[in-house]
């Protein structure tokens, strides 16, 4: 806000905060009379009217053409979010329920699906979680099983709980000794390494391998490198899209909601929104045009990263109309992300 005495500035911010709170709660444009009645602003309605005129001139609030009241602009929401000092914490009972629900997930996929369902319920918006990015995970174990003497099953297990199985046709028969040697070589090259490093190590194996294993290793390493470097981080879990249609009017112009829903279908768009916020413990709020996605101009996105012991596995967050309960949404996103991290760390 412009240069003015801090007490005037603070009071004006209180007026803006009151307008945001009332508009989010009621969907009704707010007039100065209502503000004075509902909020203990400690000044006359003439002062509030004057403050509102300044807020409007500075672009923080605007007058919808059919009403005498005012509603926040994206700039107004931004100012509000930047100055949120207290985020509404979830109650102890809510936090306990969230943790229990996540802990009963049977595996990584289930925990993430549960996280999305929870976020959508808590915020009454669309929730989205990105599967752990491959680059962040490590190989926990590689298992080699002979299905028959010329056919192997390779099983790669990562620390994020992902299991990949691939069958390799060898074109020749391997005996038990060769199989043991193959297991040892692959284990030494891959176990405990980040996927990119494991893939590089496997690609080099055929050159240094004993002669009788070379052909087998060329086939095995080709399949493994493909497995390790493919990109399942393109996978997203979405929940609560019905919440958007319930709030269709909040998306402003007719057709805006359809644009938002179409943008959500584009995984690349959503991944870009999530990728920008990968600090665990910090929540990023992008309002309207700040999303830098043309179709999302009428929406806000609240995102964070989730992960285990300081390393980020993926992004998650909530998408809804710019008229959203920011303090509540920020708290929900932060809490669910934190607990997903805790649950995954215990696995």
Curated annotation (Swiss-Prot):
<keyword id="KW-0678">Repressor</keyword>
<keyword id="KW-0804">Transcription</keyword>
<keyword id="KW-0346">Stress response</keyword>
<dbReference type="InterPro" id="IPR029016">
    <property type="entry name" value="GAF-like_dom_sf"/>
</dbReference>
<dbReference type="InterPro" id="IPR002571">
    <property type="entry name" value="HrcA"/>
</dbReference>
<dbReference type="InterPro" id="IPR036390">
    <property type="entry name" value="WH_DNA-bd_sf"/>
</dbReference>
<dbReference type="InterPro" id="IPR021153">
    <property type="entry name" value="HrcA_C"/>
</dbReference>
<protein>
    <recommendedName>
        <fullName>Heat-inducible transcription repressor HrcA</fullName>
    </recommendedName>
</protein>
<keyword id="KW-0805">Transcription regulation</keyword>
<dbReference type="InterPro" id="IPR023120">
    <property type="entry name" value="WHTH_transcript_rep_HrcA_IDD"/>
</dbReference>
<comment type="function">
    <text>Negative regulator of class I heat shock genes (grpE-dnaK-dnaJ and groELS operons). Prevents heat-shock induction of these operons.</text>
</comment>
<dbReference type="GO" id="GO:0003677">
    <property type="term" value="F:DNA binding"/>
</dbReference>
<dbReference type="InterPro" id="IPR036388">
    <property type="entry name" value="WH-like_DNA-bd_sf"/>
</dbReference>
<comment type="similarity">
    <text>Belongs to the HrcA family.</text>
</comment>
<dbReference type="Pfam" id="PF01628">
    <property type="entry name" value="HrcA"/>
</dbReference>
<dbReference type="GO" id="GO:0045892">
    <property type="term" value="P:negative regulation of DNA-templated transcription"/>
</dbReference>
């Amino acid at each position: 806000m412009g240069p003015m005495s801090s007490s005037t500035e603070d009071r004006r911010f209180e007026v803006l905060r009151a307008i945001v709170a009332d508009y989010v709660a009621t969907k009704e444009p707010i007039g100065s009379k209502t503000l004075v009645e509902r909020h203990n602003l400690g000044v006359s309605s003439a002062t509030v009217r004057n403050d509102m005129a300044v807020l409007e001139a500075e672009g923080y609030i605007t007058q919808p053409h059919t009403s005498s009241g005012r509603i926040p602009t994206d700039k107004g929401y931004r100012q509000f979010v930047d100055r949120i000092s207290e985020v509404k914490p979830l109650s102890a009972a809510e936090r306990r329920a969230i943790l229990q629900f996540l802990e009963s997930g049977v595996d990584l996929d289930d925990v993430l699906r549960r996280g999305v369902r929870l976020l959508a319920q808590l915020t009454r918006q669309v929730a989205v979680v990105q599967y752990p990015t491959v680059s962040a995970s490590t190989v926990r174990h590689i298992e080699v099983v002979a299905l028959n003497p010329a056919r192997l099953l390779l099983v790669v297990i990562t620390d994020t709980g992902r299991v990949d199985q691939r069958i390799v046709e060898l074109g020749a028969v391997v005996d038990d000794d060769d199989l043991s040697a193959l297991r040892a070589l692959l284990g030494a090259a891959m176990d405990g390494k980040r996927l990119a490093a494991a893939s590089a190590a496997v690609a080099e194996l055929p050159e240094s391998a004993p002669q009788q294993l070379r052909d087998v290793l060329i086939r095995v390493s080709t399949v493994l490198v493909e497995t390790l470097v493919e990109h399942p981080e393109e996978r997203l879990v979405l929940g609560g899209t019905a919440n958007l249609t319930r709030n269709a009017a909040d998306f402003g112009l007719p057709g805006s909601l359809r644009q938002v829903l179409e943008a959500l279908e584009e995984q690349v768009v959503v991944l870009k929104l999530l990728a920008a916020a990968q600090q665990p413990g910090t929540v990023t709020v992008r309002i309207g045009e700040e999303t830098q996605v043309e179709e999302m101009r009428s929406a806000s996105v609240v995102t964070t990263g989730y992960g285990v012991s300081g390393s980020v596995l993926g992004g998650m967050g909530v998408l809804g109309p710019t008229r959203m309960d920011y303090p509540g949404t920020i708290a929900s996103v932060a809490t669910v992300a934190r607990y997903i991290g805790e649950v995954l760390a215990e696995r």
